């Protein structure tokens, strides 16, 4: 079994880690950073950019730069109305699925495809670091992700060419990293406020056992929302002063968003931040600028509602775990947004404890995923992880009521069977609506789809006995089977109508990704060979000038001819010729260098010979004076 990497696929930033020598190691990306922005962009030349390089050009290319795609993964259009208004690219409807429009390619992407490009970069960078291809991974998701979002994350991994061995909850991964070497039993509360989601989990940790007692959260709350309140404040202030709504200009909106994120980060350490955006827009009177000072107090006032929303999941998780705040030993803070002083203060106020800040909030989730990868690969022993399902699962029954089969915070994997019957005489099929959520009425919960069992022998209502089994695997993903006890007929049911991609769509995306990966590599190879050729042309010209008359003209002429040919090939973008000429010119330069050394050695030997003769003539001199040496004291 090859190396299994752990990947924290974040809303704003992602991170990859691996077990090395029994210890988890965070892997820096190709640019040298330990976290990678979860951003994918396509340039006007149709080149794909991923990570920091994609984020840098977002202001100039807002409609073709995709970020916060995690907020759309595994969700239907009617579930992302608010989120779709907060991004600079177009979010479109395709049936009930979400699609992200890329004008420069005249194409639509699923959010899973965008997430896959981030996963591909992380796995490729990890592969370069480890010196082997990476094709297996453990990927983390927010604890409060529903079945569709978990399946969609797995699909993203498949599109990226990865076998996803396990989907693990982010707070659980953080607890693994925190508690790996701890022997004493502790009850910990993981407070995970990331870029787009918020989770709280309560766990019992000790001696290699990690048992999740409860989990709660809000998949609509994260750092992006804190950025938004600053953006709204900047836009409202500018509109009041200038009468222009900057939110209608996608390029201006992108600049505001970047400035808001920067100010938010600065305000974690400073009491105020200067926001200066020159030439944000223009009117007939001339250019307009944003110039504003944002204090920490003002920011906390703007974000007070968001901070208050963090309170409820903490209280709910403690209630579900049947624990008081006094029974919690440690509060582990996870996610970049937990650096905000107001968030730390809220946690201290609610729990009565100072948060434990010994873990790196940006990396701890990936580290935990790597540990789980080590467990699955057999590298890490004596670790037992007992996770839970975050939301209840059930079916719609008579009157539009949700009847729960598996309640939230049930340890997974788990299996539950219930017996149902028909509602009318002579009924030969049953349609069952599968739901996920905590509300009493079916219409208020998340619909995972419907399934239908045919071939039931006609009988009076209430007589047929149909066993329905819900099975949740270790990834928290649901499968359903049904059996008619009367006929003995058993059928495996695949849920349809959910917001995840079909198998055919996933396979097509896998092939597209592989094709694009090949095309991208070819494009990169062409760029590399051209850069190499241009560098060689310059170095050759410089070297010939420095050598001057130290080499014979015939050797210089051969090198110069190759240099001119290579320069012409680079100007014509003739890559095959470039490859050949680069090798030829390098050989000529090696020969030229060798001849220079030979001439230099010959000259040195000649000089040594002259010196030797001079020494011999000195030895033959008889006019030698003898003298005594006396030390002077």
UniProtKB/Swiss-Prot annotation:
Question: What PROSITE patterns does the database record attribute to this sequence?
Answer: HSP70_1, HSP70_2, HSP70_3
GO molecular function annotations of the record: ATP binding; ATP-dependent protein folding chaperone; unfolded protein binding
Q: What induces it?
A: By stress conditions e.g. heat shock.
Task: Show the ranges annotated as biased composition (Acidic residues).
Answer: 620-633
From the UniProt entry, list the residue stretches annotated as the region Disordered.
600-633
Name positions with the PTM Phosphothreonine: 197
Recite the UniProt keywords alphabetically: ATP-binding, Chaperone, Nucleotide-binding, Phosphoprotein, Stress response
**Presence of keyword Transmembrane:** no
Cysteine-cysteine disulfides: none
Which InterPro entries does the UniProt entry name for this protein? Answer: ATPase_NBD, Chaperone_DnaK, Heat_shock_70_CS, HSP70_C_sf, HSP70_peptide-bd_sf, Hsp_70_fam
Ranges of compositional bias, category Low complexity: 608-619
Q: Which Pfam families match?
A: HSP70 (PF00012)
Listed NCBIfam families: PRK00290.1 (NF001413), PRK05183.1 (NF003520), prok_dnaK (TIGR02350)
The family database entries (HAMAP family) matched by this protein are listed as: DnaK
What's this chain's function?
A: Acts as a chaperone.
Annotated family? Belongs to the heat shock protein 70 family.
- Please report the name of this protein according to its UniProt entry: Chaperone protein dnaK2
Q: Which organism is it from?
A: Prochlorococcus marinus (strain SARG / CCMP1375 / SS120)
């Amino acid at each position: 079994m090859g190396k299994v990497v752990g990947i924290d696929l974040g809303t704003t930033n992602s991170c990859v880690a691996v077990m090395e020598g029994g210890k988890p190691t965070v892997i820096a990306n190709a640019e040298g950073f330990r976290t990678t922005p979860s951003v994918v962009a396509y340039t006007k030349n149709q080149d794909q950019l991923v990570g920091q390089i994609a984020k840098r050009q977002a202001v100039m290319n807002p409609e073709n730069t995709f970020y916060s795609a995690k907020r759309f993964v595994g969700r239907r259009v009617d579930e992302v109305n608010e989120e779709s208004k907060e991004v600079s690219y177009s979010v479109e409807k395709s049936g009930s699925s979400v699609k992200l429009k890329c004008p420069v390619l005249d194409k639509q992407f699923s959010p899973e495809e965008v997430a896959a490009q981030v996963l591909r970069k992380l796995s490729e960078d990890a592969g370069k670091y480890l010196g082997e291809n990476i094709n297996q991974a453990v990927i983390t998701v927010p604890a409060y992700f529903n079945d569709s979002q978990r399946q969609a994350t797995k699909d993203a991994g498949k599109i990226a060419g990865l076998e996803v061995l396990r989907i693990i909850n982010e707070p659980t991964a953080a607890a693994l990293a925190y508690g790996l070497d701890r022997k004493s039993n502790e009850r910990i509360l993981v407070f995970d406020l990331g870029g787009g989601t918020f989770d709280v989990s309560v766990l019992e940790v000790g001696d290699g056992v990690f048992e999740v007692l409860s989990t709660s959260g809000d998949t609509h709350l994260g750092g992006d929302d804190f950025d938004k309140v600053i953006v709204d404040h900047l836009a409202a202030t500018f509109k009041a002063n200038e009468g222009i709504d900057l939110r209608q200009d996608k390029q201006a909106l992108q600049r505001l968003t970047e400035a808001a994120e920067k100010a938010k980060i600065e305000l974690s350490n400073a009491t105020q931040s200067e926001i200066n955006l020159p030439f944000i827009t223009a009117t007939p009177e001339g250019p307009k600028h944003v110039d504003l000072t944002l204090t920490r107090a003002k920011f906390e006032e703007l974000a007070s509602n968001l901070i208050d929303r963090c309170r409820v999941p903490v209280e709910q998780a403690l209630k579900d775990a049947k624990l008081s705040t006094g029974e919690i030993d440690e509060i582990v803070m996870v996610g970049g947004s937990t650096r905000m002083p107001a968030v730390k203060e809220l946690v201290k106020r609610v729990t009565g404890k100072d948060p434990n800040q010994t873990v790196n909030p940006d990396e701890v989730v990936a580290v935990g995923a790597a540990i789980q990868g080590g467990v699955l690969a057999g590298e890490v022993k004596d670790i037992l992880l007992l996770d839970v399902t975050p939301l209840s699962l059930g079916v719609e029954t008579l009157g539009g009521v949700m009847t729960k089969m598996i309640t939230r915070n049930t340890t997974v994997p788990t299996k539950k069977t219930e017996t149902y019957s028909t509602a009318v005489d002579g009924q030969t099929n049953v349609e069952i609506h599968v739901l996920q959520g905590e509300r009493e009425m079916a219409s208020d919960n998340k619909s995972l789809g419907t399934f239908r069992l045919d071939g039931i022998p006609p009988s009076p209502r209430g007589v047929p006995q149909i066993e329905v089994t819900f099975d949740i695997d270790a990834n928290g993903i649901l499968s359903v089977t049904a059996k008619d006890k009367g006929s003995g007929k058993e059928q495996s049911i695949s849920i349809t109508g959910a917001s995840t991609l079909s198998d055919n769509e996933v396979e097509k995306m896998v092939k597209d990704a592989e094709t694009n990966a090949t095309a991208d590599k070819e494009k990169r190879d062409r760029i590399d060979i051209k850069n190499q050729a241009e560098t060689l042309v310059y170095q050759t010209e410089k070297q010939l000038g420095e050598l001057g008359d130290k080499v014979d003209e015939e050797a210089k002429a051969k090198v110069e001819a190759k240099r001119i040919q290579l320069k012409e090939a680079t100007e014509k973008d003739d890559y095959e010729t470039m490859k050949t000429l680069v090798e030829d010119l390098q050989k000529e330069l090696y020969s030229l260098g060798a001849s220079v050394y030979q001439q230099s050695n010959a000259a040195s030997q000649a000089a040594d010979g002259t010196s030797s003769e001079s020494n011999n003539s000195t030895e033959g001199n008889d006019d030698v004076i003898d003298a005594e040496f006396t030390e002077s004291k």
